[in-house]
């Protein structure tokens, strides 16, 4: 699956970002969705303050990184183990990286991931 995203390759570029242009729209290849995943065609996405804190380096993250973690779109594919959704459904979502190892992740609450939320 080929898509496009706002790609950040390095942090700490000077402001104003309209001049230093830390982001570029890049073609990205995604692995096919697994049995517990969905593929969503993003129709609208936003960049917010948490994304700016990644750009300026105050919230360290592995690079390169695609920014924007709040979006709305249309479900294109639903994995075999996903219930309650069908292709064509309109959805909104917030993505927060999760480590899979901290207490909230172990309790099935990855949106509260301690390293991901830091």
Where do the model's predicted regions map?
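Conserved Rossmann-like nucleotide-cofactor binding loop
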Residues: 48
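Short cysteine/histidine-rich zinc-coordinating motifs and their immediately flanking basic loops
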Residues: 111-118
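Acidic Ser/Thr/Pro-rich low-complexity disordered segments
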Residues: 12-20, 118
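Short structural boundary motif marking the start of a folded domain
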Residues: 1-6
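Short glycine/threonine/proline-enriched tight-turn/helix- or strand-capping micro-motif at secondary-structure
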Residues: 19-29
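Glycine-rich beta-strand-centered segment in the early N-terminal region that forms part
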Residues: 30-45, 55-106, 111
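Short polar catalytic/cofactor-binding loops
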Residues: 8-14, 45
